Amino acid sequence: MSSRALTWPRTAKSSLLKQQTSSFVGQPKLGTPNCRSFSSTADRPINQSAEFSSSSKSYDRLGRRAKEKLLDREFFLSLLNSASTKREAKSYLARLKAQHPPKAQTEPTTGHSKGTVTQSLPSGVNLGSFYGASRSVYDSPVFRHDSTPLPPPSELPEERLHLALIKIRTPQLLDDTIINGVAKTLSQLSRLGMACCVVVDPGTAGNANTLRRVAAEQAERISIAVDAQPDSKSAHLDSVLSLSPMFPELPTVLSRKALLNPLRDGQIVVVAPIAYTEDVPKAVTISANDAILALTKELAGLAMRPDPDEDPWLTAQKIAKLQKEVSLDRVILLDPLGGIPSFRGPQTSHVFINMEQEFDDIKNELLHVQSSEACTATTPKGGNTFVEDPLERHLDNLQLSQNVLAMLPSASSGIITSPLEVSNSARTPQANPSDVSAVGTRRQRNPLIHNLLTDKPLLSSSLPMSRREAMNRRRGSINTPSSHTTFVKRGMPLTMIPNPRVEVWTAQNRPRLSLDDPSIDLPRLVQLIEDSFNRKLDVQDYLNRVNDRLAGLIIAGEYEGGAILTWELPPGVEDDGSPASEARMVPYLDKFAVLKRSQGAGGVADIVFNAMVRSCFPNGVCWRSRKDNPVNKWYFERSTGTWKLSDTNWTMFWTTPGLTENSQRFSDYEQVCRSIQPSWADDTGVVD
C-alpha cells in the first residue's frame, strides 16, 4: 500500500472537494493518474449503522454515491459541531490541506491516454480539470531534458506522521454501543489526518493468564468495530512489544517499521499489552501503562540506545531524524471514570491541568481524600473482579499523563475522558419523523475531535461553575459535571510574587514591592504589556503610579502572560495606614496581558486568571475595560457582575460576592475604576 502522503482514503480533503464539485456527480468515473492513489468504497462493502439515516431499510436502498454523500454530511456536521466556531473548523481544514499538498506529476506526459485527463474521487465524483491541466495542455508536445533524473520514491522524504496514542481501560465492561461509538470517533480522527494507535488495558484485577486472554479478546473486538466503520481499517498487532534479558521490567518496541507502516497506510493500530521475551520466546502480560510508556518513548525518538563509543553529534543527528518522522500530538486516556475529580472549591472536576504548576497539588489532594474515611465509605464494592479503587485509578491516570508528557514537546497534550462521553457525542441525533418542524436534538460536542481542532478543553477552566453548567445545558450534555473531560498540558511554571501560600494578599500586610525589584524582569514585563495592548507604555509614569500600591504579580512561563494587581483607594480617602483606610482599599486588576502569539492557545489566560481569583484574591477583585473591547465577552463569562460607568467609555467587572448588597463598597469600586489614569506613551486620546 502506498504511503500516507499519497493515500487519502475518504479524508476530509477529498470530501470537501467532493462537496465543492457536486455538479459533476452524474458523470462516469474514469481512471486516475498514477501520481495519486485513492481507496474506493467499491473495494469492500460499506458497513454502516442505521443511525446515519432514518431507518436501516431506507439506508440499504440508497446507492453507493448517496451513501457517501450521507456519510460526508454526517462527518462535516460532527466536525463543525465539535469546533467552538466555524472559523476553527475552517482553520483546521486549511492546516490539513497544507500538510498534504498535491504531489507533482512525475511521469512523462507523452502517451497520455484521454482517460487520465479526467480525474475522479473514489465516490465517482468527476473533478474535471480541478486537479489537472486542461486537455489542450495534455495534447501539446512536451520537450524534456533527462540529464537530471528524479530520485527514486524510496529516497524521497516521508511526510511527518501525526499520531494520537490512545488507551482504553477495561473495555470488557463496555457494551457494543459504546465500543462502536469510540470506533466511529477514531475513524473520524483518522479522516482528519490524525493516525491512531490504541492500547487495550484490561485492568489489574485477575491473574496473568486471565488478563492476557481478556486483552487479546478485547483488542480483536475493537479491531472489528473499527473495520465496521465506512472506509476504516484496523491492524491488530500482537507482537509489537518485547522484553530483553537485560531490562526485563522495561518493554521496548520490537520493530519501529512494523508499527509505523500500517499507521502510514491509514490503518488504526490496536495493541494488546503483551510482550514477548527475546531470549526464550514467551508471551508475557505487561502493564498497559508500561506499554504506553514504551510506545511513547519509541514514537518520541528516545528509545535508541546510543553506542558509548559513537560521536555524540552523530547520536543527536540520529535522534533528530527519528523525531522528524513522527509527531505524537495527543495522548488520550479513555477511562469509564472520566476526567480527574476536584475536591476543593466549587468545581467538581479539573477541566484543564497545567502539569508544571498543578501536578503536585492535585496528586496530594487525591492522596489525602483516598486516605480519609469518607473515601473508604464511598469506594464501590461488588463481585466484579475488574472493579478497582476509583481514586487509585485517577492517580494512575494523572501520573501516566505526567510521565508521558514529560517525554514529548510542549505542544503535545493529553486528554482524560470516558468512553461513554466519546460514544454519546459520536451518535447522530434522530429527529422524530412526525415532527413537522424537523428540529432534532442538539449534538453533544465530541471532546476528542474538539480538542484536535482547537487544542483546547471543551470548557474553559476559568469559567465559574454556574457558567459551566449553563453551557452544558445549552449543549444538551447528558453527563454530570463530575464526568468532565480533563485536558492536560505539560504547561508552564507559574510565579506569584509574593507567594500567597506563604503570605496572604490582604490590605493589612501589603508587600513593600516595586516593579523594579530584582526578582522582576522589568524589560520583559514591559515588552509583555506593550505586545498585548499593542501600545507603548510610559514606563516611568507607570512605575510612579503603581509602585506604592502593588499587591503582587502573576507571571506565566517566560513572561508569556501576566497580571499586575494593586490596592487602590477611592478619591478623597487618605492612605494613613489606619484600619479605616485599609478597610476602604479596593483589590484592583491593573494589567492583564498575554503575548499575541500565546493568545487563544495553551490556556495562558486561563492559568493567570485562575491564579488571580483562586489563590491571590479569592474574596474578589475588580477591573475595568473599554466598552468596545472585543475581550469583554471573555470577561463577562468570568465575572460575578458588571456595571457600565456612565459618562465614560468604561465597563467595570468584579468577582466579589455580594458586592451590590454593600452600597459603600460598590461606590468605592466604582470611584476607583473611574479615577485611575492610564500611563501610555502614545497619548492618542484613547482611554485604554
From Swiss-Prot:
Catalytic activity as recorded in UniProt: L-glutamate + acetyl-CoA = N-acetyl-L-glutamate + CoA + H(+)
Q: Which family does it belong to?
A: Belongs to the acetyltransferase family.
Alphabetical list of Pfam families matching this protein = NAT
Transit peptide, residue positions per record: 1-45
Where does this protein have compositionally biased stretches of type Polar residues? 12-25, 34-57, 106-119
| GO MF annotations in UniProt | L-glutamate N-acetyltransferase activity
Q: What does this protein do?
A: N-acetylglutamate synthase involved in arginine biosynthesis.
Query: Where does this protein reside within or beyond the cell?
Result: Mitochondrion
Q: Which domain of life does this protein belong to?
A: Eukaryota
Record's protein name: Amino-acid acetyltransferase, mitochondrial
**Pathway(s) where this gene product acts:** Amino-acid biosynthesis; L-arginine biosynthesis; N(2)-acetyl-L-ornithine from L-glutamate: step 1/4
Q: Which GO terms describe its cellular component?
A: mitochondrial matrix
| Chain spans, region Disordered | 1-59, 96-119
